[in-house]
Amino acid sequence: MHVGNPEKESRMPSPQTPVNSPFGYRSTASEVAEQVDLAGRYVVVTGGYSGIGTETVRALAGAGAKIIVGARREAHAREVLDPFEGDIAILPLDLADPQSIDSFADSVAERTASVGILVNNAAIMASPLARDARGYEMQFATNHLGHFQLAARLWPLLAAAGGARVVALSSIGHRLPGLDLDDPHFERRDYDKWLAYGQAKSANALFALQLDKLGEAHGVRAFAVHPGGIATPLQRYLTMDEQRAMGWYDEDGNVHEAFKSTEEGAATSVWCATSPVLEGMGGVYCEDCDIAVAADPDNPRSGGYWPHIRDEALAERLWADSERMVGVEFRP
């Protein structure tokens, strides 16, 4: 399947330079969205019924958007979201199942001719080795390839919106060593759940970099987001002992004081999706409601990004490899 036009002039990405945002580390999604008017605009959020996805949906719905949530667990999603105010629809979506992705995109297209915001929020982290029906490693398949295929299938709706934004949830986990495109599915090396997570999160950031490069001519801009440390169901594959060893919890089970609430964790996603400060910009990695700076290699606990997620050649290769893996030629 072919999507889009392969012959479009590309441009340089926006610089990784903070914009002195009025919001910051402890800002909440509702604070970011308070002055935003999304009335009549369709927004798609994957996994918008758990963790920071829930607060992303709450804030964007509160701004007047018509929300479509892609949910692997529909019944649970309805339990969570039914009490919310606003226009919120829930549709089945399994990001590890190509047919489910296509069906979801078709259902979205039946509801609207345009999508103004796509938030690729759903993720799994540090899971035991598992493979999808194609044999692809599950973290890479779910976190990156599923969202790549979804963006490709929704591309005509994004391009039709006039100023659409795509928000790709990355993580500080991108700083775990590298992205091995010669063996992304751990077929020739021992599986490491953290390396698998790190390369999937690197792929999310590189996806945003390349999508922005290709989509700018169509008015579609993309952003990568590190939401911060938040205690959510994302940690479900980790034991409490593992989380204590990483300093996330103390011996009494109290979460580290630097962790954000789920509403604070959703703030940067909402900021990237809506902030007027970002007009004319894209392809950047953001954290704490601002564009991030390069990480200090001597301080592994500091914020910021590592250079490989700004590597345009790596982003281009990942894009081409992703097209091959999902069988979709995605050329905006």
Report residues per predicted region:
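Pocket-edge positions in alpha/beta enzyme catalytic cores
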Residues: 69, 93, 257, 307-310
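Rossmann-fold NAD(P)H-dependent dehydrogenase/reductase core
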Residues: 4-244, 248, 324-332
